[in-house]
Amino acid sequence: MKIGIPRGLYYYHYKDLWLSFFKRLGIDVVISEKTTKDTIKKGMQYSNDEMCISLKAYLGHVVSLQGKCDYVLLPRIENYGLNTQTCNNYISTYHKITNLLEIQAIQYNISLTKNKTEEKEFLKWSSILKKSKKEIKEAYHLACLDAMKIRKALEE
């Protein structure tokens, strides 16, 4: 199995967690190329006028992963608690992508106001990834530790 990760939006914040998580489960990862004019042009073919350039680039990254992986990771962060809602265009991106493109997506939604934590959302992937919930939970916790170590090292 191969998971595609678009190199956009929250990628640079979460990449260490995601890469460690999938590596610990023995799952191959393919990351889209760095953003170029072509990436944005590809994304513009599937976007509307109200979408910001970041979302257009993100769509381009997803398009570039078509045919290179079994599933594309499409995170959705609705909020981190009260008064922290993200952009409505961003929140709807998962649905736009899955309706416009022929891809299989792995999605998770963080919404602390709805008690949807990252860990709970990762556990939902067990059937897709063909791993037990115990394996998912262990890989998630170890990946969180890995990501924290990397962030600490970068801060020093």
Model-derived segments and spans:
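An N-terminal assembly and electron-transfer interface module characteristic of large anaerobic redox
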Residues: 1-156
